[in-house]
Amino acid sequence: MTAATAPDGRRMLRLEVRNAETPIERKPGWIKTTARMGPEYQALQQLVKTEDLHTVCQEAACPNIYECWEDREATFLIGGSQCTRRCDFCQIDTGKPADYDTDEPRRVADSVRRMGLRYATVTGVARDDLPDEGAWLHAETVRRIHADNPGTGVEILATDFSGNPDLLAEVFSSRPEVFAHNVETVPRIFKRIRPAFRYERSLDVITQARDAGLITKSNLILGMGETRDEVSEALVDLHDAGCDIITVTQYLRPSPRHLPVARWVRPEEFVEIKAEAEAIGFLGVLAGPLVRSSYRAGRLYAQSMRAKGRELPEGLAHLADPANGFAQAVG
């Protein structure tokens, strides 16, 4: 794929053509990682290779793979490789998804078992083509991982299911350790960047999850045209909606077809934002240039449980152990 073509030979959208007029930006020197391959990472890498397992971590070339795999955490994508919605920052392509695969929950749970994961994040594409928008698939994947891996925590990073309380209730009923729904950006530019989503609806999804008794989580991506004051306002909105955990990251442009980077946020601003979010009252906060919403997810879950005065389930007490890894994403 070049700057002038789109995946699978489809025509470029007018927005993509306009985006492609701006060359890919050169990253500043502070956005870098070192490939520190600890023993747990190397063991997982070998297992994934020999067992033909698939995670978002390696397929999206996540910069935090060395650290997360060292802590036996990984992320899986369900529902297919194509999304029925298009967000201008997201590398997942938009199109007609593949047929519904009812065996996927079993396969994901089996991968979790074979990888010996301590904590698994499950995310899915939007499936507006389905009557339940993929709610059963999300819920069943959580249920199957829990059933087959009682010592593994599960976080679901979900679409908004159009805000439908019945569909959301199906997902909530699977009782993930954390329910995450990412707002990603601020109200003023939300519709331009996420045209199929609605800011207030996303906040309401988080509120519904909170009311269902779940630990809740969201993410903000900086560098897409927001102002610093708007970041503060979005943090307050999310906390007021019932969000327990927040991650904040730098936008990195996936290809010339995607939204150009508006600004590079310096590390000291992320430190400032983290302190601000903690002062607002979030129970768990990670902010940094290479933080991703699933980064150190098990640690943030354990931290939030302690802050709420809740006991970690006996089978998940290991998530409160001193963290392994190298903490590159926040530096």
From Swiss-Prot:
MF terms in GO: 4 iron, 4 sulfur cluster binding; lipoate synthase activity; metal ion binding
Classification via CDD domains: Radical_SAM
Binding site for [4Fe-4S] cluster 1: C57, C62, C68, S294
Pathway: Protein modification; protein lipoylation via endogenous pathway; protein N(6)-(lipoyl)lysine from octanoyl-[acyl-carrier-protein]: step 2/2
Reaction catalyzed: [[Fe-S] cluster scaffold protein carrying a second [4Fe-4S](2+) cluster] + N(6)-octanoyl-L-lysyl-[protein] + 2 oxidized [2Fe-2S]-[ferredoxin] + 2 S-adenosyl-L-methionine + 4 H(+) = [[Fe-S] cluster scaffold protein] + N(6)-[(R)-dihydrolipoyl]-L-lysyl-[protein] + 4 Fe(3+) + 2 hydrogen sulfide + 2 5'-deoxyadenosine + 2 L-methionine + 2 reduced [2Fe-2S]-[ferredoxin]
EC number annotated for this UniProt entry: 2.8.1.8
SMART domains in alphabetical order: Elp3
Pfam families documented for this protein: LIAS_N, Radical_SAM
UniProtKB keywords: 4Fe-4S, Cytoplasm, Iron, Iron-sulfur, Metal-binding, S-adenosyl-L-methionine, Transferase
Annotated compartments: Cytoplasm
PROSITE patterns referenced in this protein's UniProt entry, alphabetically: RADICAL_SAM (PS51918)
Catalytic class of the enzyme: transferase
Primary location class: cytoplasm
Domain Radical SAM core: 69-283
Domain of life of the organism encoding this protein: Bacteria
Cofactor(s) the record lists: [4Fe-4S] cluster
Disulfide-linked positions: none
Family classification: Belongs to the radical SAM superfamily. Lipoyl synthase family.
Protein name listed in UniProt: Lipoyl synthase
Source organism (scientific name): Clavibacter michiganensis subsp. michiganensis (strain NCPPB 382)
